[in-house]
Regions:
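Catalytic phosphate/metal-binding cores of nucleic-acid and nucleotide-processing enzymes, i.e., regions
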Residues: 1-152
Length: 152
């Protein structure tokens, strides 16, 4: 099925985001290592059992960029769409990964994910992704109960 024929969803936003990443690997060679973690999705009972045996876990973020930048050791992005919110397991995972030194955020669009990824890639030294310029430019906010950056 062509992307243009698909109804807009988390899946289409993730496809658009990963297409952008693949098309910018010449500009940002480290994007070669960005990847989707297939922990979600609906599977039949047999396939779900096999994936669980293989190590699939609930709550793991959608996208991993295991490349250190600024003060971070890597980046996790959870993509959502519409009114979807992170599950309790996703919030725990994001908090744990932040404590381990990763930058973690929830993005509600491919465009938002691209913007925060570009900001992350361009970090230098011990820089963080929570300065005023980031707030102004990327509509950065931390959800009061989740404690995780949310990018629109």
């Amino acid at each position: 099925m062509k992307l243009a024929d698909m109804k807009r969803s988390e899946d289409t936003e993730q496809i658009l985001f990963m297409q952008w990443c693949r098309s910018h690997e010449d500009e940002y060679p480290q994007l070669h290592w960005i990847h989707h973690i297939p922990n979600g999705g609906n599977r039949n009972r047999k396939e779900a059992a096999k994936f669980k045996q293989m190590g699939v876990k609930a709550g793991i973020a959608d996208i991993c960029f295991p490349y250190p930048k600024g003060r971070y050791v890597g980046m996790y992005i959870e993509l959502k769409y519409g009114d979807n919110i992170p599950t309790p397991q996703q919030r725990v995972f994001m908090r744990e990964m932040e404590l381990a030194g990763h930058y973690c955020c929830i993005c509600y669009s491919a465009a938002g994910a691209v913007r925060v990824l570009q900001e992350y890639i361009n970090l230098s030294g011990g820089a963080e992704l929570n300065g005023a310029s980031f707030e102004e430019e990327f509509e950065y906010r931390v959800h009061k109960t989740w404690g995780i950056p949310v990018i629109n």
